């Protein structure tokens, strides 16, 4: 059985997330999704939803066999525990495949690193980014203060 791991923040679940996880599932027989904890999200604004809610939403997707919370300090701990055959990175994730492969090798984790395909919007106004969803909410519903999105960091 080929075990696949996909990981991400999965905040404000949207069709881009669903596509990523469905694509990742095609790399093997069993898909495990690791949901990042707030403490590990340093490259973009902090998640709006708590980690447990994000995990539960991801777990509800048909493509996902099991969803796990990430480790609060070391992102490689759940990967070591799951011992995957393949890790599939998201289309727009900032990680470099070679860097991830090297970090895995340093920890004695023997698995392939792949990159999921992207997905174009299928209809007008479809949003494939959590940031775009937040921006639309702020635009349509307004904000009590300037820079509300930046304040989430």
Curated annotation (Swiss-Prot):
Reaction catalyzed: FMN + ATP + H(+) = FAD + diphosphate
Keyword DNA-binding appears in the UniProt entry: no
InterPro entries: Archaeal_FAD_synthase (IPR050385), Cyt_trans-like (IPR004821), FAD_synth_RibL (IPR024902), Rossmann-like_a/b/a_fold (IPR014729)
Cofactor(s) listed: a divalent metal cation
Keywords, alphabetical: ATP-binding, FAD, Flavoprotein, FMN, Nucleotide-binding, Nucleotidyltransferase, Transferase
Disulfide bonding pattern of the chain: none
GO BP term, example: FAD biosynthetic process
Pathway(s): Cofactor biosynthesis; FAD biosynthesis; FAD from FMN: step 1/1
UniProt protein name: FAD synthase
Organism: Halorubrum lacusprofundi (strain ATCC 49239 / DSM 5036 / JCM 8891 / ACAM 34)
């Amino acid at each position: 059985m080929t075990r696949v791991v996909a990981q991400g923040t999965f905040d404000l679940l949207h069709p881009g997330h669903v596509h990523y996880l469905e694509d990742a599932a095609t790399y093997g027989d069993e898909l495990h999704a690791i949901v990042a904890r707030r403490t590990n999200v340093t490259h973009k604004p902090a998640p709006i939803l708590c980690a447990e809610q994000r995990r539960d939403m991801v777990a509800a997707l048909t493509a996902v066999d099991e969803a796990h919370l990430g480790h609060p300090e070391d992102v490689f701990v759940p990967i070591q525990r799951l011992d995957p055959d393949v890790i599939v990175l998201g289309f727009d994730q900032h990680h470099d495949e070679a860097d991830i492969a090297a970090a895995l090798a340093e920890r004695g984790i023997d698995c392939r690193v792949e990159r999921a395909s992207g997905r174009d919007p299928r209809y007008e106004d479809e949003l494939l980014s959590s940031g775009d969803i937040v921006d639309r909410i702020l635009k349509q519903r307004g904000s009590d203060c300037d820079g509300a999105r930046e304040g989430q960091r």
